[in-house]
């Protein structure tokens, strides 16, 4: 039987000589407003927001497995409430203390109130959770317990790396999926520590940042929307925004995930690799009206969620049953505190915001022109050096690619993904679109003080086909998700080249391999910031599943045999990354202006048709020559001297289904350059640059077989290196 104590009474954790009001009066005002359970010198301060609660309690537990609390402490509404903030100091408690909140109040769904006095509630400001969701025969769900954490850690001088966004190469990975396979050979598979063991691989690949799929705490099974009772492998149904996922800890000790995540970040930073978090700040795992109550819904539903004005039903812009009321001052404050927490406590370098357009919506779901939350994040001084990347759309039709927020924000460029896929698939009239994407997507980002690096270029992401499957399947194959193959996107711009799925056919395998190399080459030779998905460098497959959100198995896991079996593609990818990192011409800080080399000057970009003449964008020709002129010394200086040796770039692309004869551009400026082959997808593997420069003549054609790419580079006299 739990012991219930009022805060004005003595209790087992320490004898009070002061009233609760006197205790709170001794604390700095900022401490009172620091929500959550905070360690103090001689106890723990609990702070929680609720506007309409009539009573609040903190339930204290001894172990994560406890069904009933060891003690229940009631807040005194007369002395422990400051406006809508409830706060109580309990002496004698210390870090490691487990707790829930419990709140009394009205249940009136039409008015937005869903208080349940029996519900055990996770603290929205929990810094860590312990235990699992417990299901009782009566249908009640008990969530994990919140933990008062010990925040001490020896960072050994670690600081944020602050790589320039324009120089960033992102690698998207799932903490568990990266090392869960037995083939990983790590001591701690599927964990933060497992990632540490694979840092040499990341370092050899050459990426500068890892973008981690959600690591904030989430239930292992989904309670949201139509996906209820499915495995929540991806983690896009959060329950505690501030808390690292305990399932990724190698230790079962409560709170140990805090230390292990810090160890991982410290180790990645030591390898000069930044850490970007994919944060889901648009909904929670509490689902819709018939979903469970285990946190915000039971504390202040009417504030935290977007609700229909007449019925109190949940607005569903996330596709997951509910939507955070992100621009309400209380919710906005929580989100900003959350981001600061990750930056300050874990040294996180940046964030990718899932369904970021939701963060621009007001309580009625209307898109703000100047959303208060976005402005708060943009102007937050602690986030000033933090990378901000928006997935600039949502599940209700908002699409803000190219128009999201301000110059502080980069964006996942969905147009880049679609246009590159369509060009190399051979769709009609895609050459102009390819050129626009190669040059940094000025059609999307040339305004609002933006530059090419505001475009995060990707061809695949966790959400959709892998690169291998993009050239192996015409349709999605999500039967393993048990949703009758109704989930996942139907519009993938994929092509199997004759046989659906895997094949031993050598000719077909060669075509698919070439198309993968074509798209990888395009990605790393484009202006903007490239993002590679873990495994695309070595033919990882999901067997045609383009929505593997619930597949915690070999469908999703990284198979560590692949880098060995497909070492040629891995080395090809490493070469592309090395070429990009060594050549500032591919990492321009400003948009290209164009020009003509026939005038005797070197333009920053020039476009040619296969016959060597200037391109006719309306011809429907599926082949293209692109010239990127190297930046001048003055331009490099103005761009803060990016690392590497600037080289001119000449790119030949042939998406046609037959061989094409390309004439070298006749401009003397281009002809006289000392060209060497840098990338050649005509071969079955990457061609290393020739030892001696190659001489080309305008009258001698360059032959490109069907669906192939050739990239030449020529040196200048300017060398920069940081």
Specify the residue positions occupied by each region the protein language model found.
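Conserved alpha/beta catalytic core and glycan-binding cleft of carbohydrate-active enzymes
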Residues: 126, 347, 360-363, 368-534, ...
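Short catalytic/ligand-binding loop motif for oxyanion handling, primarily in non-cytosolic enzymes
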Residues: 108-112, 179-181, 218-222, 283-286, ...
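Short, flexible loop/turn elements at secondary-structure junctions
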Residues: 50-52, 79, 92-94, 105, ...
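Hydrophobic faces of well-ordered beta-strands that scaffold small-molecule active sites
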Residues: 169-171, 210, 275-277, 351, ...
């Amino acid at each position: 039987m739990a012991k219930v104590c009022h805060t004005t009474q003595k209790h087992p954790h320490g004898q009070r000589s002061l009233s609760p009001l006197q205790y709170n009066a001794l604390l700095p005002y900022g401490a009172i407003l620091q929500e959550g359970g905070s360690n103090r010198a001689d106890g723990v301060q609990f702070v929680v927001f609720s506007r309409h609660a009539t009573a609040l309690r903190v339930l204290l537990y001894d172990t994560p497995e406890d069904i009933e609390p060891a003690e229940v402490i009631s807040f005194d509404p007369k002395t422990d409430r400051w406006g809508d903030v409830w706060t109580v100091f309990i002496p004698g408690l210390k870090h490691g203390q487990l707790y829930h909140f419990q709140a009394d109040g009205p249940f009136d769904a039409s008015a937005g109130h869903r208080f349940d006095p029996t519900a055990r509630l996770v603290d929205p400001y929990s810094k860590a959770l312990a235990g699992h969701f417990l299901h009782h025969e009566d249908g009640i769900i008990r969530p994990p317990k919140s933990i008062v954490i010990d925040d001490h850690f020896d960072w050994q001088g670690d600081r944020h790396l602050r790589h320039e966004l324009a120089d960033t190469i992102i690698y998207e990975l799932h903490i568990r999926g990266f090392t869960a396979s037995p083939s990983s050979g790590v001591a701690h598979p599927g964990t933060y520590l497992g990632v540490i063991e694979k840092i040499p691989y990341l370092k050899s690949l050459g990426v500068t940042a890892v973008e981690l799929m959600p690591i904030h705490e989430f239930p292992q099974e989904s309670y949201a929307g139509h996906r209820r009772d499915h495995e929540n492998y991806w983690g896009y149904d959060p329950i505690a925004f501030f808390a690292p996922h305990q399932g990724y800890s190698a230790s079962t000790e409560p709170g140990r995930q805090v230390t292990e995540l810090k160890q991982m970040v410290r180790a990645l930073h030591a390898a000069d690799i930044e850490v970007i978090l994919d944060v889901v700040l648009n909904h929670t795992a509490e689902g819709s009206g018939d979903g469970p109550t285990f946190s915000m819904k039971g504390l202040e539903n009417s504030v935290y969620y977007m609700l229909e004005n007449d019925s109190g039903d949940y607005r569903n812009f996330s596709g997951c049953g509910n939507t955070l009321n992100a621009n309400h001052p209380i919710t906005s404050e929580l989100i900003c505190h959350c981001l600061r927490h990750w930056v300050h406590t874990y040294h996180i370098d940046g964030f990718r915001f899932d369904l970021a357009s939701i963060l621009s919506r007001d309580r009625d779901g209307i898109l703000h022109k100047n959303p208060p939350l976005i402005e708060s994040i943009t102007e937050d001084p602690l986030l000033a050096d933090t990378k901000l990347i928006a997935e600039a759309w949502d599940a209700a039709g908002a699409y803000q690619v190219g128009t999201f927020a301000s110059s502080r924000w980069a964006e996942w460029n969905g147009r880049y993904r679609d246009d590159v896929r369509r060009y190399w698939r051979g769709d009609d009239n895609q050459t102009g679109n390819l050129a626009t994407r190669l040059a940094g997507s000025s059609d999307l980002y040339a305004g609002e003080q933006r530059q090419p690096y505001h475009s995060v270029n990707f061809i695949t992401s966790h959400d959709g086909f892998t690169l291998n499957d993009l050239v192996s399947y015409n349709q999605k194959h999500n039967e393993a998700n048990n949703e009758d193959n109704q989930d996942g996107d139907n519009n993938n711009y994929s092509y199997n080249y004759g046989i659906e799925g895997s094949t031993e056919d050598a000719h077909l395998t060669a075509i698919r391999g070439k198309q993968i190399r074509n798209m990888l080459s395009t990605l790393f030779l484009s202006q903007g910031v490239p993002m590679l998905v873990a495994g695309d460098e070595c033919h990882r497959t999901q067997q045609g599943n383009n929505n593997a959100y619930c597949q915690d198995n070999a469908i999703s896991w990284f198979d560590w045999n692949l880098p060995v079996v497909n070492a040629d593609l891995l080395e090809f990818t490493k070469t592309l990354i090395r070429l990009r990192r060594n050549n500032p011409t591919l990492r321009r800080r400003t948009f290209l202006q164009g020009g003509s080399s026939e005038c005797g000057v070197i333009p920053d970009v020039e476009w040619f048709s296969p016959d060597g003449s200037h391109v006719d964008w309306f011809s429907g020709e599926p082949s293209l020559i692109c010239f990127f002129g190297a930046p001048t010394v003055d331009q490099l200086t103005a761009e803060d001297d990016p690392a590497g040796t600037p080289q001119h770039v000449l790119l030949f692309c042939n998406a046609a289904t037959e061989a094409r004869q390309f004439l070298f551009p006749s401009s003397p400026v281009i002809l006289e350059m000392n060209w060497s082959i840098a990338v050649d997808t005509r071969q079955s593997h990457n061609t290393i640059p020739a030892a001696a420069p190659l001489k080309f003549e305008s009258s001698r054609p360059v032959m490109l077989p069907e669906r192939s790419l050739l990239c030449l580079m020529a040196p200048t006299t300017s060398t920069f290196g940081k």
